[in-house]
């Protein structure tokens, strides 16, 4: 069984912030992922914050996690440049992002 981190950005909308983590958990269960951590932070136009990237890399080193499950690339960054930059930094540590 592969081990994964769930990552999502909180929108401030109660229904959405409740529904998204449940959807991501179900996706992990249906696809054979063991959830090691569920991480979230307020939505930002920059995407994943530097402290969150640091936390994900730390979990990768301590928990042997190499997959991040998220709802869409928009949760990684608001622009293609932000997304590519984040994916590049994470891939240096053999961490890959899978969106549903």
Whereabouts are the PLM-identified features?
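Short, structured surface patches at the beginning of a domain
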Residues: 1-100
């Amino acid at each position: 069984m592969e081990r994964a981190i769930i990552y999502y950005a909180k929108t401030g909308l109660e229904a959405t912030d409740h529904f998204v983590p449940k959807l991501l958990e179900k996706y992990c269960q249906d696809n054979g992922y063991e959830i090691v951590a569920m991480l979230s932070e307020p939505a930002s136009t920059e995407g994943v914050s530097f402290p969150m990237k640091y936390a994900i890399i730390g979990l990768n080193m301590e928990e042997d996690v190499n997959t991040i499950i998220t709802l869409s690339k928009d949760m990684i960054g608001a622009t293609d440049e932000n997304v590519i930059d984040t994916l590049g930094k994470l891939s240096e540590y053999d961490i890959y992002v899978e969106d549903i």
